[in-house]
From Swiss-Prot:
It is found in: Host nucleus. It comes from the Viruses. Interacts with B1/VPK1. Interacts with host VRK1. Interacts with host VRK2. Its main location: host cell. This is Pseudokinase OPG198. Residues 1-283 form the Protein kinase domain. Belongs to the protein kinase superfamily. Ser/Thr protein kinase family. Poxviruses subfamily.
Length: 283
């Protein structure tokens, strides 16, 4: 793909390819719409057709994150926006497939408490929508939460999970999956090989919140075995958990209550999103 100056998506839109932003399992390029503009305002994610996570991500954008459904859902609830990117193009070459979204800015790094509270509410709203569509995100971590012009975006839908079997019964808890992701933010269920359920998404968000509020995750730089051991212990002793996350004793009570509520959820339980959200809504 490096030899191409431009490519066309399935709707015939031309995308001019710029510098590489990231190279890992997939490659991210800066792209722009035409030759007259010098600004690369979009990002193209591209991978080989044999790479299933990118195909799953494209399908998820099309079937679950459609703009009309999002617009109706937010209007009914009086929500300004969800942290879900718009899709601007999908395409393929002989060997590759790709999609295009806006350049969504930098990793969210809050500068004040007010922005943290707002981010918590926005992310709970966003996860509630994804869960209402019968899926979980499965990969909530700081590098997947971006901000541009005071607007958050949750990216990377390559590890989404379907929550329900035929007949609308919840999937069973089975520890039979190969785990993947950043072990620092991974939920306990995922560590143990279970599919991420609603409580898992909210648990991972909680670990992001701890850092947003100025705390530290006590298991960072530990081996994966030690990380899961610590997380399981901390679920039993939440007071100790927050003593280690906030050694100066400045943990927000709203955050403590959020973690307490999330830790008590059953695997297949639908959370009380309103209750979680109200913790962070400032009058």
């Amino acid at each position: 793909m490096e030899s191409f100056k431009y490519c066309f998506d399935n709707d015939g839109k031309k995308w001019i390819i710029g510098n590489t932003l990231y190279s890992g399992n997939s490659i991210l390029y800066k792209v722009r719409k035409n030759f007259t503009s010098s600004f690369y305002n979009y990002v193209m994610k591209i991978d080989h057709k044999s790479h299933k996570p990118l195909l799953s991500e494209i399908r998820f954008y099309i079937s679950v994150l459609d703009p009309l459904t999002i617009d109706n859902w937010t209007r009914e609830r009086g929500i300004k926006y969800l942290a879900i990117p718009d899709l601007y193009g999908i395409g393929e070459t002989d060997d590759y497939m790709f999609f295009v979204i806006k350049n969504l800015g930098r990793v969210f790094a809050p500068k004040d408490t007010e922005s943290v509270f707002e981010a918590c509410v926005t992310m709970i709203n966003t996860l509630e929508f994804i869960h209402s569509r019968g899926f979980t995100h499965g990969k909530i971590e700081p590098r997947n939460i971006l901000i541009r012009n005071k607007r958050l975006s949750l990216i990377d839908y390559s590890r989404t999970n379907k929550l329900y079997k035929s007949g609308n019964s919840h999937i069973d808890y089975n520890e039979d999956m190969i785990t993947s992701g950043n072990i620092n933010y991974m939920c306990v269920d995922n560590h143990l090989g279970a599919t991420v359920s609603k409580r898992g998404d909210l648990e991972m968000l909680g670990y992001c919140m701890i850092e947003w509020f100025g705390g530290k995750l006590p298991w960072k730089n530990e081996s994966s075995i030690k990380v899961i051991k610590q997380k399981k212990e901390y679920k039993k002793f939440i007071a100790t958990f927050f003593e280690d996350c906030f050694p100066e004793g400045n943990e927000p009570l709203e955050l403590v209550r959020y973690i307490e509520l999330v830790y008590t959820l059953d695997y297949s339980q639908t959370p009380n999103y309103d209750r979680l959200r109200r913790l962070f809504i400032q009058d």
